[in-house]
Amino acid sequence: MLSPEALTTAVDAAQQAIALADTLDVLARVKTEHLGDRSPLALARQALAVLPKEQRAEAGKRVNAARNAAQRSYDERLATLRAERDAAVLVAEGIDVTLPSTRVPAGARHPIIMLAEHVADTFIAMGWELAEGPEVETEQFNFDALNFPADHPARGEQDTFYIAPEDSRQLLRTHTSPVQIRTLLARELPVYIISIGRTFRTDELDATHTPIFHQVEGLAVDRGLSMAHLRGTLDAFARAEFGPSARTRIRPHFFPFTEPSAEVDVWFANKIGGADWVEWGGCGMVHPNVLRATGIDPDLYSGFAFGMGLERTLQFRNGIPDMRDMVEGDVRFSLPFGVGA
């Protein structure tokens, strides 16, 4: 087994078997047969132990050369078969980019977003403009400029989220009314704007309250505006959101930033076949002190404002019993409203 002829025969047999292996499984069996522990080349290495010491070195070189030759043939064939396998996998798993894609079911847009966009479209069609403001506000814009007294309950921590440190006079806005002040300070008169955004109050999340809610607020400041203009705007808004038969009424109320002030109710046919008056929001003529705070002469200009919660509007308009459904992110809640309604 240690003769050059025997080693050459073993190497030739191994290389021939390796060359004929056409799969990785066959090649693995060939390796076991010709390079494994009981292969002729392995037995030749074991036979070195019984040779005389003076012959062992030369015979060892021949055995190692023979095994290395067989191993190189195996490694080359292994690389070739692996490359062929990988190429076949790429072809089998290839993607035809010209094929039409598999349709993914469309998700549902949140009904609050759809309602906000519909409100915006309604007022833009009336010639109004959209206005925005920051959610982190100062007491100056959220309370002071809106004629809130220093001891007004709304300023308390039981109603308002304040930003640390205590003397920063910053808070999460409790209404979108600060946008009124920022707009009047930044724009030329007349002003007709609608602002829609998130507001924050320290309410517990329950069936009718949420600490984060969306509010729509309208402001008009021009020469000669009156409560009649306010009523006409509210009626048009109500018909756009509740249908052509909807109508509004106002009841005296108090807000620091309007005088006179009123709460507005809306009458409409609801989703369960009935009709009734429902409290909708607040409104009134802009208080002269608010106009003065923005450098506007109340003897020359007047204005009106109104504000409604979108969650509440959606809740009683669509007969939603629990406001928590609007914030839990369950797509099953959004789907009945339609993808793009």
From Swiss-Prot:
One of its GO terms (biological process) is phenylalanyl-tRNA aminoacylation. It is found in: Cytoplasm. GO terms for molecular function: ATP binding; magnesium ion binding; phenylalanine-tRNA ligase activity; tRNA binding. Binds 2 magnesium ions per tetramer. Tetramer of two alpha and two beta subunits. Mg(2+) binds at E259. CDD domains: PheRS_alpha_core. The gene is pheS. It catalyses: tRNA(Phe) + L-phenylalanine + ATP = L-phenylalanyl-tRNA(Phe) + AMP + diphosphate + H(+). Its EC number is 6.1.1.20. Coiled coil: none annotated. This is Phenylalanine--tRNA ligase alpha subunit.
